[in-house]
Amino acid sequence: GSIGVFAATIAFFVYRAFGSMMFGPTATASHVLVKDRARAEALKAEIEADVAGGAPLRAKFARVAEQHSTCPSAKKGGELGAFKPGQMVKEFDAVVFSGEIGAVLGPVDTQFGSHLILVTDREEAKK
């Protein structure tokens, strides 16, 4: 039910806030969180079709996040801001810190549901 979604969302942000704060690479990303993989795959196909038809990727991704994502970040078009490894769940981190920048990645399944991820920037570790 909705209590479970609320608890999972709170856990996600608590994990983010108190995760590793070490120096390291930083990524900036947006995501769409939905309950199941089939829904995520359908939304990814919709995004890719619209972009192939000339729609700007970031704007389309943000619209899909606002309309379909169950994460509170939906209000900001799915934007998660900048974060370091260890601030997100490991399945999410693995994709964000290795996947292509500027492409729709996923679906990535975590304990929260199925994510589509758009990495908008990544900086290597500061020396």
Which residue ranges define each predicted feature?
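A generic "cationic amphipathic patch" detector
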Residues: 45, 77-78, 109, 126
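Peptidyl-prolyl cis-trans isomerase
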Residues: 49-91
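Second-shell loop/turn segments in exported
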Residues: 29-33, 41-53, 79-82, 103
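A general structural signal for well-ordered alpha-helical packing
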Residues: 40, 44, 61-62, 93
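Proteostasis/folding factors centered on peptidyl-prolyl cis-trans isomerases
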Residues: 2-37, 91-126
